[in-house]
Amino acid sequence: MSLISNNEERSLRVRYCIAIALSALLISGCTTLRLPNQSTSVYHQQTWAQRYYDLSRISQWNIDGAFSIQQPGKTIIAAYDWQQKGMNYRIRIHSSLDIYSVNISGRPGMVTLWRSPRQHYTASTPEQLMQQQLGWQLPLSNLYYWIRGIPAPGAYQADFDTYTHLIALQQSGWHIRFSQYTTVGSVDLPRTLQLSNGPLAVKIVVKHWQ
């Protein structure tokens, strides 16, 4: 579904406005989203097989935080709220003052992006849809796994710390570093992820895990 020229111009203006509005989030993100130091003594010592089993069983969560995307000539910064139930999800991407907001809802084979209650678009993958409508994308299909600190299905190379936390991962052309974990209940979950793929660099901060 293509937009008429007036809508394209309005979309470009909105994208320009969000870049300005969200620059404040980029500046404040280093402070308001700075994570407290956590003693490694609270971490759970497990074998990788045990840790992978526990993390792979998590299929429902509510998380929020912020992310930044840096690519040649463009920097995107936004906050997000991510609700996951099984393979179905809803993600709201918004500015700190809600000047700009989009909603992405998906299930296997069908993803919808909502700009407003009457303006929505669909695609078969979230990456395709975000690139078409936002001009940038996050690897959401794989982040379903990476956000829990486990590899997605398929070939990968990984490094672990002494607690068997995944700290570095190469998969599907991406290099992922897990620079901080937090203990939630009986499991340790990522707080900060740094992803790179060629000239594209992404940082994701999880502020709250539920």
Curated annotation (Swiss-Prot):
Signal sequence annotation: 1-29
Lipid attachment locations (N-palmitoyl cysteine): 30
Signal in keyword set: yes
Any GO CC annotation of this UniProt entry: cell outer membrane
Annotated keywords: Cell outer membrane, Chaperone, Lipoprotein, Membrane, Palmitate, Protein transport, Signal, Transport
CDD domains: LolB (cd16326)
Primary localization class, coarse: membrane
Subunit record text: Monomer.
NCBIfam families the record matches: lolB
Function: Plays a critical role in the incorporation of lipoproteins in the outer membrane after they are released by the LolA protein.
Similarity section: Belongs to the LolB family.
Record's protein name: Outer-membrane lipoprotein LolB
UniProt organism field: Coxiella burnetii (strain Dugway 5J108-111)
